Regions:
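Catalytic cores of the polymerase beta-like nucleotidyltransferase superfamily
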Residues: 1-163
Length: 163
C-alpha cells in the first residue's frame, strides 16, 4: 500500500527541498527525521493496511516502521536508534490525531522526546495533504496552562505552624 506515484513524488520533492533549506541554514536534522520525511507516507500507508486487518493504529504504525526500516533485503542497514526514533515520530502522529491538542495529555505529549520532530513531520505532511492542515492548526495553537506553575513561597497554600 502507500500513496500513489504522483503524491509520493510530490512528497519526496518537498522533503528534499526542506533538506536543502536546512542545509543552507546550517542546520542538520536528526537522521530519524530525515528517514521519516523520506519514507513516512509509505510507512503510514502500510500502517493503514495493518490497521485494516485489525491491529490497533499505534501498533500498526510501529509494525510498519519495522517492516520498512528493518527489512533485511535492504542494502543499507539502518541503526536501531534511528528506527526507534522514526517509530517515535510516526507514533506521535497517531497520538496527535487522538488528542485535541489542548488537554493535559497534549501538554505531556508536547514534552515527549521526539515531539518537535513529529511536529516538523506534520507541518511537511500538511503541505502535501490538506486533510492534515486542521490537525497542524490544533497542535501549533498555544497550549493552555493547566496549573503547573510552581507556588510562590509565602503563599496561602504553604503549611503554617499551628499555635
Amino acid at each position: 500500500q502507500g500513496p500513489d506515484k504522483h503524491e509520493a513524488m510530490n512528497w519526496v520533492k518537498k522533503a528534499l527541498r526542506q533538506f536543502d533549506v536546512w542545509k543552507q541554514a546550517g542546520l542538520k536534522p536528526m537522521p530519524a527525521l530525515q528517514h521519516a520525511l523520506l519514507f513516512g507516507p509509505y510507512m503510514e500507508g502500510l500502517a493503514g493496511a495493518y490497521a485494516a486487518e485489525g491491529l490497533p493504529e499505534f501498533e500498526a504504525t510501529l509494525q510498519a516502521v519495522n517492516t520498512v526500516l528493518r527489512d533485511k533485503a535492504n542494502l543499507t542497514q539502518i541503526p536501531k536508534a534511528v528506527v526507534f526514533d522514526v517509530e517515535r515520530i510516526l507514533g506521535i502522529q497517531v497520538q496527535m490525531r487522538k488528542s485535541s491538542g489542548q488537554s493535559k495529555y497534549a501538554a505531556r505529549l508536547r514534552h515527549r522526546n521526539g515531539f518537535n520532530e513529529a511536529l516538523i513531520y506534520l507541518k511537511l505532511a500538511s503541505g502535501v495533504d490538506p486533510a492534515r492542515k486542521e490537525l497542524l492548526a490544533r497542535w501549533i495553537a498555544p497550549a493552555p496552562h493547566h496549573g503547573s506553575e510552581p507556588k510562590a513561597h509565602g503563599s496561602a497554600h504553604e503549611n503554617k505552624p499551628r499555635n
